[in-house]
From Swiss-Prot:
Gene3D superfamilies: 1.10.150.530, Aldolase class I. [4Fe-4S] cluster binds at residues 111, 115, 118. Residues 97-340 form the Radical SAM core domain. S-adenosyl-L-methionine binds at residues 165-166, 197, 219-221, 302. It comes from Acidovorax sp. (strain JS42). Disulfide bonds join 104-345. The active site is at 91 (proton acceptor), 345 (s-methylcysteine intermediate). SUPFAM superfamilies: Radical SAM enzymes. This is Dual-specificity RNA methyltransferase RlmN. The gene is rlmN. HAMAP family: RNA_methyltr_RlmN. The keyword Disulfide bond applies.
């Protein structure tokens, strides 16, 4: 069995090359070919010695993921469904905007956290993705979009680990992938432009702060433990006082001077003025008094079958945002993107609900021609 080079950060690739009797600079050349130029054929790598290319052909490969479907929303959002084997699929979403291109990447097939408002959580958990499978989503999207655009310029400027799965429950694979994204010989993204979203895995938040601090988003969704226990079951293990303390510790290392709190607006559940006032009391104090330097991103709920939940009316969202803003908390309302192709926040299970349906859907989708990006 040969080794997939997408599984390595630069240090890992250097160690691999050294085992082949090669110098570290060869790893840097190889790394650039893979991540900056999107090469998977060693014969394309013209500045590598022929002897090294022959060695690589015998022991290594560059294996991306098979895109078994691609859908383009009316707003330009692109969603890919990738086959990760054994009846599992993950979804990746590209969101184009005037000043940036953001890729939303999955870290797990399914999710074990089970948030009530998230369709992916209702799918259940299948397995962690490997480092190579996490990076393959970026590798595929960047080079496919760049090739189709035709000018060779970078397309993806921001990465958010907000797809399927809880990234911090796949820590061993996540951190090497983040390092490749940040490496100047890889994708060269700024730490401020790479965001890890977590539902609040407190010990791993502390480790990430030490190992690879990038921008952090926390799925908050409730202003008190009673409600959050119901919406985000992980809160029963790491309640709000522990979560906020971890956020304050993270800010000592973070590339941004604030934490983004994500808050899914659910009609009659967490969208009342009293909930906003509780949030202000929870985070709006000075850090020494238990507050957190933060901004809020209010997310309209994207309904899915059997959720039993409804999207908050626009007027309720506006009033909620105004209360937070009046208290001096920077607050935005997320624009819903890609909901016509089930690519919006919380929809990333699509209609993939269990392993049987995954297999049935893959068999069907492999007969469908992939649509071009426009």
């Amino acid at each position: 069995m040969t080794t997939n080079l997408l599984d390595f950060d630069l240090d890992g690739l250097a160690a691999f090359c050294e085992r082949l009797g090669e110098k570290r600079f060869r790893a840097t050349q190889l790394f650039r070919w893979i991540h900056q130029r999107g090469a998977s054929d060693f014969d394309q790598m013209s500045d590598l010695a022929k002897s090294l290319r022959e060695k690589l052909r015998g022991c290594a490969h560059v294996a991306g993921l098979q895109a078994i479907s691609e859908h383009v929303s009316a707003d330009g959002t692109v969603k890919w469904l990738f086959d990760v084997g054994d009846g599992n699929a993950v979804e990746t979403v590209f969101i184009p905007e005037d000043d940036r291109g953001t890729l939303c990447i999955s870290s797990q097939a399914g999710c074990a956290v089970g948030c009530r408002f998230c369709s992916t959580g209702h799918q259940g958990f299948s397995r962690n993705l490997t480092t190579g499978e996490i990076l393959a989503q970026l590798w595929y999207a960047e080079h496919a979009l760049r090739q189709r655009r035709g000018d060779g310029e970078r397309v993806i400027s921001n990465v958010v680990m907000m797809g399927m799965g809880e990234p911090l429950q796949n820590y061993a694979a996540l951190v090497p992938a983040l390092r490749v994204m940040l490496d100047d010989h890889g994708y060269g993204l700024s730490r401020r432009r790479v965001t890890v979203s977590t539902s609040g895995v407190v010990p791993m938040m502390d480790r990430l702060a030490q190992d690879c601090p990038v921008a952090l988003a926390v799925s908050l969704h409730a202003p008190n433990d009673v409600l959050r226990d119901n919406l985000v079951p992980l809160n029963r293990k790491y309640p709000l006082h522990e979560l906020l303390a971890a956020c304050r510790r993270y800010l000592d290392h973070a590339p941004r001077d604030f934490i983004t709190f994500e808050y899914c607006m659910l009609e009659g559940v967490n969208d009342q003025p009293e909930h906003a006032r509780q949030l202000i009391d929870l985070v709006g104090r000075k850090a020494a008094d238990g507050g957190v330097s933060c901004k809020f991103n209010l997310i309209p709920f994207n309904p899915f079958p059997a959720s039993g939940l409804r999207r908050s009316p626009p007027a309720a969202v506006t009033a909620f945002a105004q209360l937070l803003s009046d208290a001096g908390i920077v607050t935005t309302v997320r624009k819903t993107r890609g909901d016509d192709i089930d690519a919006a926040c919380g929809q990333l299970a699509g209609d993939v609900k269990d392993r049987t349906r995954v297999n049935e859907r893959m068999a069907k989708l492999r007969t469908i021609e992939i649509k071009p990006v426009i």
